[in-house]
Each structure stands twice: as C-alpha cells, then as structure tokens.
Amino acid sequence: QLLELGYNRNGLGISLSGRRLEWMRSEIPSNGNLKSSSANLLNYIPAMCTQYTYMLTNLHPYTAQIGDAVYNNSGEIGGQADIFYNFKRGSALGGKRGLKIHANFSTYYTLHKEGTAKAGKLLYRDISIDIEKQFTRKFKAVLLYSMQEENPSYGRKSATRLQNVFVADLQYKFTPKFSTRLELQYLTTHEDEKDWMAALLEINFAPSWSIYGSDMYNNGGSKIHYFNAGVSYARSRTRIALSYGRNREGLLCSGGVCRLTRAYTGANLQITTSF
C-alpha cells in the first residue's frame, strides 16, 4: 500500500508519503531452495528515503525490506516527510540571491505481524537538513547534516546503530567552462567502525571533461584510506568514465538501486548511453 500527499504554495513545499510492503519479493529459487540472493531477484523496490550522493551519508544505505522467509521477516511499514522552503531574494535570510532549505524525516519498521499495519522493530531512521546558498555568481555552497539510525540485523534483533554526518559541498566557477567542486565530510559514531572522514576534489572542463580525486579514511577504527581517482568524458548522449582506487566491502548505491560489492583495489570502466 502507498499513500502520498503534497502541498506547494508561496515558496513552501511539503511532501508526505507512507508505504507498507508485505511479501513483495519475487525471485527464482536458487538450487531448488528459497535462499535469498540478489543474483536471482526478479524485482527491485527502491527505498523511500533520501537518496544521498555523498560518500559518508551512503556508508550504510537503507534497502527496502520486501519479505524474507529465511529470517521470518514479512516486510516493512513506514514513510517520509519532505519540507522545502525558498527564501526570496531581498529577504532577511534570502539576501541578494535567495536561500534554499530542505528537511527530511524518514523511518521504517518491520511488520509486527503478517496481515497487519502494526510496526515492529526499527529498521531505519534518518533526520536531515540541507541548506543551499548562492553567495556570488561564481560561488555556491551546500551544507548538510544527517542523523541516521539503522538496524544492522535487518530487523532480526532490536539493536540499532546511530551516526551523525556533516557535509560541506563548495562549488566555484572560474569561467563558464572551468569550475571546481570540493566536498568535506565527517561521520561521528560510537559504534561499528567509529569515526570516518572524507574529501573529494572535482575539476570540470565544460561541456565534456571532468577529473576527480577522493579519499575516505576510517580514522576511528581500521585507519585505512579508501582512495579513488578518475576521469570522465561526455559527448551527446554518451558518457565514458575511467577510475582507479580502493573500494570497501558493502552496498554500492546509485539512483536508489543498491548492490553488494566485495572489497577490492583496481580500475573501473563505465560507459553510459541513452537512445
């Protein structure tokens, strides 16, 4: 079941959504049994929560629980609320070029019992706020804070992990064809792998070329650097990207679609085109 409500007036936008999933998994049995596997999953249902693009906000992404007979988990229930507000140009907070604020609250629980809408154990909760400000024609900044609480056992146990993530996204346009973007991120938590820090520098040569370098460092635990560097070229409807670096084991998400990846150090070549 899905319910959505929206309101938009005078720079204020509010979006409310709620969803209940029960036994929505559709898959081909592997080796004659019902063991769950992402390799034989026929359908994918995206999580209804903020889809982050920053490294540390995506460290433990949420995936929708669509029913798992092995762990006796029939589904999930929850929802999210989005609030957008644009401060007009010339106002006290808007200043010369305006100010945009977005806040999100999302939370999901297991189903306490099949066939009911009663919530069980907490699966995921996220409270976030981001502020976007165009200071000059050349300089724009985005500041984000996210408090995430997730259940590492996917509802089999009640224990959860809490983390706070801070992000500064700074963009500067030197010329219409040459710009840079700098990301500074920090994650603080007393659990799991403890604190993380990350940084990314991106240099763009419009309209085709882009190069970047990034590093994600587990300063509270393993003391391992997860570095990456890459270059991309885009023309017409095709984009080619080549990168090299160290990647950690975990869920890799893009556009709301997540897949489990192993830890590895190596190169990646990606070709994207549209018809």
Predicted regions and their residues:
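Exposed, low-structure sequence patches enriched in small/polar residues
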Residues: 1-275
